[in-house]
């Protein structure tokens, strides 16, 4: 049966090359959905806390495949080759500006959209930031070309914390979400640490029916998932999903714990987490050792009460005052965060 499916796929590919990726995708998705259904008596496995190996429904399109400007961009484009040539050497932001100034399609704030097909997702890339000026240009050097090859509409939001309070990564993500939604009706949010560099452009930065964990294999963890509930580094949710879970918690001052709380929120809302298959989720991390940032010692007490806090601490109790500036490649959102800006009522 599997051999027949493969043969049928080859025949479909040869006969459908000129009619556009959307039709081709629908045919192949239908064929694979039937295969999945015959195994599980459903279109999807019951447990979605897994890699996408079982759910993978299409191969990457061949080089000579034709798709049209009025069709939705495919998810698996010929331009997505897999391994990326990673260059971790420092580079000045001025040099990054010069490199991408040659592309007139990149608008102020780093907005870009494809011209040869209709983007499947409008993606806001949110980057929490403090004192990482040497890391940001390295990230942009890799992410911009990758997202262009994936034919996503995207923009970058650098959410920078100033002041004397410990770094609050989760609250910065909430601020970034609120500000990004003022610009465009984004439908996919990528929460991206500035020191995480993807190693494969087949790690598609779109969203799906379930929240997505992209950074599953980090070099600093020997390319192993530290634990099943690990949700750190790079994750993605649709706007609907993010609002349903009430965003990130605001109460995590210092590093550690906020990603575990996000995992709990996702599970409490009835979602599961999907992950890329195999080596697609590999990332290199820029060493930094949390320079000057304190570890949040109260994280375990908060995590024990994740469910009780979820409806009280997040997007619905967030207050802030932002200073907005624009770079050629990103929008900078500067905030001075304090605990008083996100007080939690007793639970």
Model-derived features with residue positions:
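Hydrophobic targeting segments
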Residues: 121-127, 143, 155-158, 176
